[in-house]
Amino acid sequence: MSKFRFEEIAINSTEKKKPVESDKYTYLGLEHLDPGTLKVSRFGSDVAPIGEKLVMKKGDVLFGKRRAYQKKVAIAPFDGIFSAHGMVLRPKTEVIDSEFFPLFISSDYFLDAAIKISVGSLSPTINWKDLKNLEF
């Protein structure tokens, strides 16, 4: 069976924006992602988030790269903005089925491999430069 580097399977969308007041309604932070489910059940903020955030589109896979051992993965339920402590991932559909992709990202197979490349002790984080080279 062929193996693929993660960058051959997924696109890491790095488009960012500085939030405006109305973005508080469509903001997702890591605190909104629950381990064990791809569904988002809460979102938003009382005030506009501060600092640049990642732009997400409905259907994107949101992955918590900070403290990845918490296994926070979800499917974006709408267009909006996402925490810069995460990654906005999209499947390369010529390689992986778009419906399977979120299941793969939330699998122990993927998450265990990703956690192993986390750097830092207080708040371990996964860097794209390391993740993109993992083979699956």
Language-model region placement:
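Short aromatic/basic micro-patch
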Residues: 27, 63, 125
